[in-house]
């Protein structure tokens, strides 16, 4: 069965964004508080995986790459997630610590973009989070050589069985696994609006103070 190209029908896919607005008067002066409010609203609205975010990094070859991870914490110090340090993103961050994050809550017609410098969290933080994970996930951190080419899924299954037997119920945190923290120096909050006249508020860190400004859509 042949299929016709979707290019023409894709070009016609569009919707009008009319759920909400974002004004300077109604937004927080501190972008972290604005993010906290929007994340809470996404959770309350039962948005699927509201904690999922895209992480964009750039390698030494200047080629950007993205992937979706789950945020595991946020405070005045930054945004935290956990991963394999030997993964592609881990290697890219080691060579270039600048990265960008994006949350897209489709149901609320909202996007949050965050830029800044990434650093590793402390060993104690990584240990605490690792040991809070389900056992299968802790074994998986040992079993998967993330981002490396493998011969088959069977290798992962065999590795999981091997490390499960080796560590029983108490696997330690792998030395190649831990947390990253992005320290923001720029935030952008995007709220879809009618006629493509969307609201965009950007916060830039200037001499320790957040400067808020409106961007054209």
Swiss-Prot record:
<feature type="binding site">
    <location>
        <position position="133"/>
    </location>
    <ligand>
        <name>substrate</name>
    </ligand>
</feature>
<feature type="binding site">
    <location>
        <position position="88"/>
    </location>
    <ligand>
        <name>FMN</name>
    </ligand>
</feature>
<feature type="binding site">
    <location>
        <position position="137"/>
    </location>
    <ligand>
        <name>substrate</name>
    </ligand>
</feature>
<feature type="binding site">
    <location>
        <position position="190"/>
    </location>
    <ligand>
        <name>FMN</name>
    </ligand>
</feature>
<feature type="binding site">
    <location>
        <position position="129"/>
    </location>
    <ligand>
        <name>substrate</name>
    </ligand>
</feature>
<feature type="binding site">
    <location>
        <position position="200"/>
    </location>
    <ligand>
        <name>FMN</name>
    </ligand>
</feature>
<keyword id="KW-0664">Pyridoxine biosynthesis</keyword>
<dbReference type="InterPro" id="IPR019576">
    <property type="entry name" value="Pyridoxamine_oxidase_dimer_C"/>
</dbReference>
<comment type="function">
    <text>Catalyzes the oxidation of either pyridoxine 5'-phosphate (PNP) or pyridoxamine 5'-phosphate (PMP) into pyridoxal 5'-phosphate (PLP).</text>
</comment>
<feature type="binding site">
    <location>
        <begin position="67"/>
        <end position="72"/>
    </location>
    <ligand>
        <name>FMN</name>
    </ligand>
</feature>
<feature type="binding site">
    <location>
        <begin position="14"/>
        <end position="17"/>
    </location>
    <ligand>
        <name>substrate</name>
    </ligand>
</feature>
<feature type="binding site">
    <location>
        <position position="72"/>
    </location>
    <ligand>
        <name>substrate</name>
    </ligand>
</feature>
<dbReference type="InterPro" id="IPR012349">
    <property type="entry name" value="Split_barrel_FMN-bd"/>
</dbReference>
<dbReference type="InterPro" id="IPR011576">
    <property type="entry name" value="Pyridox_Oxase_N"/>
</dbReference>
<dbReference type="Pfam" id="PF10590">
    <property type="entry name" value="PNP_phzG_C"/>
</dbReference>
<feature type="binding site">
    <location>
        <begin position="146"/>
        <end position="147"/>
    </location>
    <ligand>
        <name>FMN</name>
    </ligand>
</feature>
<protein>
    <recommendedName>
        <fullName>Pyridoxine/pyridoxamine 5'-phosphate oxidase</fullName>
        <ecNumber>1.4.3.5</ecNumber>
    </recommendedName>
</protein>
<feature type="binding site">
    <location>
        <position position="89"/>
    </location>
    <ligand>
        <name>FMN</name>
    </ligand>
</feature>
<comment type="pathway">
    <text>Cofactor metabolism; pyridoxal 5'-phosphate salvage; pyridoxal 5'-phosphate from pyridoxamine 5'-phosphate: step 1/1.</text>
</comment>
<dbReference type="InterPro" id="IPR000659">
    <property type="entry name" value="Pyridox_Oxase"/>
</dbReference>
<dbReference type="InterPro" id="IPR019740">
    <property type="entry name" value="Pyridox_Oxase_CS"/>
</dbReference>
<comment type="subunit">
    <text>Homodimer.</text>
</comment>
<dbReference type="GO" id="GO:0004733">
    <property type="term" value="F:pyridoxamine phosphate oxidase activity"/>
</dbReference>
<feature type="binding site">
    <location>
        <begin position="196"/>
        <end position="198"/>
    </location>
    <ligand>
        <name>substrate</name>
    </ligand>
</feature>
<dbReference type="Pfam" id="PF01243">
    <property type="entry name" value="PNPOx_N"/>
</dbReference>
<dbReference type="GO" id="GO:0008615">
    <property type="term" value="P:pyridoxine biosynthetic process"/>
</dbReference>
<comment type="similarity">
    <text>Belongs to the pyridoxamine 5'-phosphate oxidase family.</text>
</comment>
<keyword id="KW-0285">Flavoprotein</keyword>
<comment type="pathway">
    <text>Cofactor metabolism; pyridoxal 5'-phosphate salvage; pyridoxal 5'-phosphate from pyridoxine 5'-phosphate: step 1/1.</text>
</comment>
<keyword id="KW-0560">Oxidoreductase</keyword>
<keyword id="KW-0288">FMN</keyword>
<dbReference type="GO" id="GO:0010181">
    <property type="term" value="F:FMN binding"/>
</dbReference>
<feature type="binding site">
    <location>
        <begin position="82"/>
        <end position="83"/>
    </location>
    <ligand>
        <name>FMN</name>
    </ligand>
</feature>
């Amino acid at each position: 069965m042949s299929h016709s190209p979707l290019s023409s029908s894709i070009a016609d896919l569009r919707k009008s964004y009319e759920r909400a607005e974002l004004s300077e008067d109604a937004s927080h002066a501190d972008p972290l508080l604005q993010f906290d409010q929007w994340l809470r609203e996404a959770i309350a609205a039962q948005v699927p995986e509201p904690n999922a975010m895209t992480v964009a990094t750039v390698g030494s070859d200047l080629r950007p790459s993205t992937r979706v991870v789950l945020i595991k914490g946020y405070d005045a110090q930054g945004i935290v997630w956990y991963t394999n340090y030997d993964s592609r993103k881990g290697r890219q961050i080691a060579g270039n610590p600048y990265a960008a994050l994006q949350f897209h809550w489709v149901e609320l017609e909202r996007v949050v973009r965050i830029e800044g410098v990434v650093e590793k969290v402390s060993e104690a933080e990584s240990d605490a989070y690792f040991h809070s994970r389900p056992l299968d996930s802790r074994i998986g951190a040992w079993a998967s050589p993330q981002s490396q080419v493998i011969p088959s899924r069977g290798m992962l299954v065999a590795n999981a069985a091997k490390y499960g037997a080796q560590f029983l119920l108490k696997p330690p945190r792998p030395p190649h696994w831990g947390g990253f923290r992005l320290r923001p120096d720029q935030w952008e909050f995007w709220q879809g609006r009618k006629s493509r006249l969307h609201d965009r508020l950007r916060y830039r860190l200037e001499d320790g103070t957040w400067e808020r400004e409106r961007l054209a859509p």
